[in-house]
């Protein structure tokens, strides 16, 4: 296999974090006096920086946006962070990659302290100690986080591939010159139009379950 490093997103790629994230999102919305949006809209909060999602959905800016984000973070850190489930087959994938001598890094929009806590709690640190998350001010772009995950591994972007479930993962990988594998079992890329929108970019395959990722790496492309 030409890829020597696999960089994984967390939400919607390693873990189904929907229960915890949505619980904290709802807490922040209710405490600011807003009505809850539809379930479809709520699900769009999973993955991107939460302050950006509050701005997008409620039009809040400045202090109000920061207050909503603070409410979310306090609740998430103290109550909801570990309300998550590893996707079936993800540890089988990690073991197979490790057995083949392929390095693993993690790059997530989760804040750095949250990322370290949840990754270690579920045991992914058995396979990697490179866990790169967002800064406390939310200034880092996904491309910055991905680049850091590659740099810390000692690999090059040309020998690395990003695995994720959102367009932000796809764009972030492309911005640093990396290949990308899109997963459909998470929160993004649920519709054919979503997948079609990223074809012809840096995408080398579409994974419908975690073990599909290994097959894509072994053959170099997704035949579906």
Predicted segment positions?
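Glycine-rich phosphate-binding loop signature in dinucleotide/nucleotide-binding domains
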Residues: 1, 99-102, 152-159, 220
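N-terminal helical cap/lid subdomain that shapes the substrate entry/recognition surface
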Residues: 2-92
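Conserved Lys-Pro-Asp/Glu-containing loop-to-beta segment of HAD-superfamily phosphomonoesterases
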Residues: 5, 142-172
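Substrate-recognition element of Asp-dependent hydrolases with the DxDx(T/V) motif
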Residues: 25, 90-119
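Conserved H-loop
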Residues: 35, 125-129, 156, 204
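A structural signal for the hydrophobic beta-strands that form the central parallel beta-sheet
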Residues: 106, 133, 162-164
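A short, structured active-site edge motif that brings together acidic residues
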Residues: 125-140
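Acidic, Mg2+-coordinating phosphoryl-transfer loop and its flanking beta/alpha structural elements
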Residues: 162-205
């Amino acid at each position: 296999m030409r890829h020597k490093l696999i960089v994984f997103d967390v939400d919607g790629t390693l873990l189904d974090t929907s229960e915890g994230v949505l619980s904290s999102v709802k807490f922040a919305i209710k405490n600011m006096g807003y009505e809850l949006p539809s379930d479809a809209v709520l699900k769009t909060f999973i993955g991107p920086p939460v302050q950006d999602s509050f701005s997008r959905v409620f039009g809040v800016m400045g202090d109000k946006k920061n207050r909503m984000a603070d409410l979310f973070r306090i609740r998430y850190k103290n109550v909801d962070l570990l309300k998550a489930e590893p996707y079936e087959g993800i540890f089988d994938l990690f073991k197979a990659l490790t057995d083949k001598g392929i390095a693993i890094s993690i790059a997530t929009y989760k804040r750095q302290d949250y990322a370290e806590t949840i990754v270690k709690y579920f045991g992914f640190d058995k396979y990697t100690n490179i866990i790169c998350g967002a800064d406390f001010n939310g200034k880092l772009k996904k491309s910055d986080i991905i680049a850091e995950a590659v740099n810390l591994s000692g690999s090059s972007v040309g020998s690395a591939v990003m695995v994720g479930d959102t367009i932000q993962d796809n764009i972030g990988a492309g911005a640093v010159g990396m290949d990308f594998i899109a997963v459909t079992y998470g929160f993004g890329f649920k519709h054919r139009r979503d997948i079609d929108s990223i074809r012809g970019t840096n995408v080398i395959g579409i994974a419908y379950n975690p073990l599909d990722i290994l097959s894509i790496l072994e053959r170099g492309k997704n035949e579906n």
